[in-house]
Amino acid sequence: MNSAAIAVRPISTETVLQNHLRAAKIGVDAIMEDYTDESVLITHEATYRGLAEIRRFFTTLFGALPRGFFDELQLIRHEIVDEVAYILWERKPQIARATDTFVVRNGKILVQTFAVMQ
């Protein structure tokens, strides 16, 4: 069989989301594997563009959270529509509700929004 005829199956939005949720339990280096230098993360405080800015956001976030924080995260809602993933989650008592929306392209997070509701 000609190697050019072998198709590479694209990584699904669901796969990227599940990897992202697992990576959050591991740490910043693992979570950064889901992004590219074209990625954008939008929060209520700022917009972070590219790997360096997104890494800075997650380094600060992970430094402020107690060890094992993401192990206790409860997923309330999880919706995938084509290249868009939405999650609603809680981690009481610290976080009553939070949402993330992800736009996934080529197996990476292109755009993410993140908001916490107290």
Question: What are these model-derived regions, one by one?
Answer:
Residues 1-9, 18, 22-25, 42, ...:
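A beta-strand edge to alpha-helix "cap/lid" segment located at domain peripheries
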Residues 45-46:
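Short, solvent-exposed loop/turn segments at secondary-structure boundaries
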Residues 26-38:
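Short, well-ordered alpha-helical segments enriched in acidic and aromatic residues
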